[in-house]
């Protein structure tokens, strides 16, 4: 280690570790500015926050100890309880317990078996809320695919919500295009407005339905809808006549 006494700065190279309060930082290289109370770590960085039960991994981190904020760059990951967030860039506000992930952001909820992909993700850990910014994809229980933008996810309720034009694909190959939606992960229930449903009959045939509002029970494969318009694939009546 190198200690510049006049500047109150410490530089370390190789297998470095900083321990303070309920946090530890390990990395190949560590710099500490004692006056500003700022840590900079590079290469194989791991931050353990024992108070919040959170571990952060990254290529580089800057830890502003006075403000209790961490900024990461490159191959960033935050892990706590049943959740994992990965991105190129992470910001962690320890006091408010808020994570912000930018660029190729992914939030995985292993308990709910759901993964959200977005340009930007903000996770309010205390309230168990996630808000995305920009184009957003979600994969629920490895069965239901969502394409939307500016999505809200209320983890305790199991609600995935968007007021933007969206599409949903179920595990039977049916596609739902909606002006807005609320999906409950626990009940596997989709509610949407101005819904176009493309129901897959087989590989070459699709029935199309329009509902001004619809409630779709994926688990029991049933629905309740208002103002229904039906466009049936052209071979339906031909097949009936041949019977």
Protein language model regions, located:
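Structural signature for solvent-exposed beta-strand/loop edge elements and short helix-capping sites
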Residues: 1-243
